[in-house]
Regions:
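Conserved phosphotransfer cores of two-component systems
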Residues: 44-48, 70-78, 86-90
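Charged docking surfaces used in two-component/phosphorelay signaling
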Residues: 17-25
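Acidic catalytic/metal-coordinating carboxylates
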Residues: 35-38, 63-66
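C-terminal output helix
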Residues: 102-115
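The feature encodes the CheY-like receiver
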Residues: 16, 60
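Short hydrophobic/Thr-rich beta-strand motif most characteristic of the beta2 strand and flanking loop
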Residues: 27-35, 42, 79
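Active-site residues of response regulator receiver
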Residues: 56
Length: 116
């Protein structure tokens, strides 16, 4: 089975709720987590569910970049987008970067770009 889920990680619950509602209306299977430890546990429980993770760079516990690395130990082909309020030069771990604040439509476009 081809994974289709999106795992979105950010320590701002209001932003997570907004993105979840928007992306679900577009037909995505969305799971949200407010921390890296919770996200890693969720991913480890269902690694074949998620096609992509979208994570904030600055998270309590471990950075978004570290989180992506740990997830890719289980699924090397996992696609990823990092978000941050600070400029960030994406490394090999990420296929995309979105500077905060961003519009939900910009995230949808970044997801489509990362999927292709």
């Amino acid at each position: 089975m081809i994974p289709t889920g999106l795992l979105i990680v950010d320590d701002e619950p209001a932003l997570l709720g907004l993105l979840r509602r928007y992306l679900e209306r577009l037909g995505y299977d969305v799971e949200t987590c407010t921390g890296s430890t919770e996200a890693l546990a969720r991913f480890q429980a269902e690694p074949d569910r998620f096609a992509m993770t979208i994570t904030d760079l600055s998270l309590p516990g471990m950075s978004g970049e570290e989180l992506i690395g740990k997830m890719r130990e289980l699924r090397p082909q996992l696609r990823a987008i990092i978000t941050s309020g600070y400029y960030y030069e994406p490394l090999a771990e990420a296929v995309g970067f979105l500077q905060k604040p961003f519009l939900p439509q910009a995230l949808a476009e970044a997801i489509e770009k990362a999927r292709s």
